[in-house]
C-alpha cells in the first residue's frame, strides 16, 4: 500500500508489544501530525512510557512528522467543531487530505467514521495485523499472538469482533 497517516493509539499499542515495524510491511510512507507526536512522544516521555522512546526513534528514521498547512487547516476547519475527535485525530485527518494519503491508521470509531466521509480508508491496529498476515510478513500464529498482546496492552474489542478476527486469521493462507 502507499502512504498513510497515523493517529496515536495504533502507534502506542504496536510499540507497547514490540510490533511497530509491522506498519513498514504494509505502507511505503507513514506520516503523523504534530499533535500525534506531542501525545505519543512528548507526553509519553513525561509519563516515562517505554513506547514513547520506541516511537521517537521511529520518527527520526521512518515515521515522518509533518505539520498541517494553514491552507488545509482553513479548508477543513469544520473538523475542529467535532467534539468527539481529539486534536490528534483532527490533525491526522487534515494531514491525510493535505498529502492525498489514502489510508488513515486509527482505532477510534468516530475518527474512522469521519475518515470514510472524507473518502479516506480507515485501517485499525487489527486491520494492520490482518494485512501483515495477508502480505506474508507474519504467520498465523504470530497474528494470533499479536491480537492477544494488543488486547493485553489495552485494545478494547468486543467478543464478536474478537471471534471474527480469529476466524479471518484462521482462514488466511
Give the predicted meaning of each segment.
Residues 106:
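Short beta-strand and adjacent tight-turn residues that come in two discontinuous sequence segments
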Residues 112-173:
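Acidic, PIN/NYN-like endoribonuclease modules and their adjacent C-terminal/linker elements
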